[in-house]
Amino acid sequence: MAAGPRTSMLLAFALLCLPWTQEVGAFPAMPLSSLFANAVLRAQHLHQLAADTYKEFERAYIPEGQRYSIQNTQAAFCFSETIPAPTGKDEAQQRSDVELLRFSLLLIQSWLGPVQFLSRVFTNSLVFGTSDRVYEKLKDLEEGIQALMRELEDGSPRAGQILKQTYDKFDTNMRSDDALLKNYGLLSCFKKDLHKAETYLRVMKCRRFVESSCAF
């Protein structure tokens, strides 16, 4: 029987539906392990959504013979690469949890503006059928990261520092080649940045709570 995978899926769905920690002094407070579990699940969900959308956009609009060259142009440059954030798991393991949370927060906040235009670009997308909710999902993950920061710092919430330079808005004029290239580059950066945030959160969760699933 497939009771194992089904149980795991139901547990993951239940965790995604859980609220974040209560206000200070409220009861009951969510354990730190649950905060990390929720954040990792949300980051994984967003990263997969971004990856699926990138692939769908690529299949629909970018000729296969042009994909490699386009990916190596300035259109594929992500300005988040200019911040001193770890580029992979090994580098992330050299940073403190608080540093990784701050980098994760910066990455998430840099997309809060641009993703509000996704629903206009992908109105007929099967993968992004709920694109108007991506902003809500990002805000939810932002809230979870801030809850973790409150727990790991001094217990008092800090105002999240939004990157001074955020990504451009997605272009809704899908008949323009320039708009297609711009959106293709943005989707590539969105996927890369969410992968970074997911990696940071998984590294933190694994080194705090020893698990058999830490290999990734």
Swiss-Prot record:
Q: Which GO terms describe its molecular function?
A: growth factor activity; growth hormone receptor binding; hormone activity; metal ion binding
| The keyword Cytoplasm is assigned to this record | no
**Cross-referenced SUPFAM superfamilies, in alphabetical order?**
4-helical cytokines
Q: Which UniProt keywords apply?
A: Disulfide bond, Hormone, Metal-binding, Phosphoprotein, Secreted, Signal, Zinc
Its subcellular locations are:
Secreted
Which InterPro entries does the record cross-reference, listed alphabetically? 4_helix_cytokine-like_core (IPR009079), Somatotropin (IPR034975), Somatotropin/Prolactin (IPR001400), Somatotropin_CS (IPR018116)
Q: What is this protein called?
A: Somatotropin
Family matches, as Pfam families? Hormone_1
- Give me the Gene Ontology terms describing cellular component: extracellular space
Q: What does this protein do?
A: Plays an important role in growth control. Its major role in stimulating body growth is to stimulate the liver and other tissues to secrete IGF1. It stimulates both the differentiation and proliferation of myoblasts. It also stimulates amino acid uptake and protein synthesis in muscle and other tissues.
What Gene Ontology terms for biological process does this UniProt record contain? animal organ development; growth hormone receptor signaling pathway; positive regulation of growth; positive regulation of receptor signaling pathway via JAK-STAT; response to nutrient levels
| Statement: the UniProt record of this protein carries the keyword Disulfide bond | yes
Signal peptide feature range:
1-26
PANTHER family the record matches:
SOMATOTROPIN (PTHR11417:SF2), SOMATOTROPIN,PROLACTIN (PTHR11417)
Positions of post-translational Phosphoserine modification? S131
* Intrachain S-S bonds: C78-C189, C206-C214
The UniProt family comment states: Belongs to the somatotropin/prolactin family.
Q: Where on the tree of life does the source sit, at the highest rank? A: Eukaryota
Protein residues bound to Zn(2+) = H45, E198
